[in-house]
């Protein structure tokens, strides 16, 4: 690729980044139930539920793996159905019931499956 073409591509990428950073993004208010507890949060229209759970709500038990819904690392239950959180928008959780690995724990401690994950360093599972 010629230097002029490379410079043009770099400028185009810089311009895209600049536009993304200056365009205000409307936030969506969402009310949902997570592991039996009511939650309310703000998210943008493109934010994944995985990102909301981890970055906004601090529920880091749900892991990011492939970001394509194939690996299962981000699996949650949404209204009782197993789904990859990386493929669900945060706004889609409005009025729905979410279950995460944090909700599996028992009052007496870790669920036996959680304990095995811990014992065998199955951190992405």
Question: For the regions a protein language model found, what residue spans apply to each?
Answer:
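Signature of N-terminal electron-transfer/Fe-S-associated modules in redox systems
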Residues: 15-125
């Amino acid at each position: 690729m010629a230097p002029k073409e490379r410079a043009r591509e770099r400028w185009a990428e810089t311009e895209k980044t600049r536009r993304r950073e200056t365009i205000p993004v409307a936030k969506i208010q969402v009310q949902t139930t997570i592991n039996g507890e009511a939650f309310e949060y703000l998210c943008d229209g493109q934010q994944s539920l995985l990102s909301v759970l981890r970055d906004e709500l601090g529920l880091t038990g749900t892991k990011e793996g492939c970001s394509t819904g194939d690996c299962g690392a981000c699996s949650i239950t949404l209204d009782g159905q197993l789904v990859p959180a990386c493929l669900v928008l945060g706004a889609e959780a409005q009025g729905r019931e979410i279950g995460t690995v944090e909700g599996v724990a028992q009052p007496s401690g870790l669920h036996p499956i959680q304990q095995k994950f811990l014992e065998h360093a199955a951190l992405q599972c």
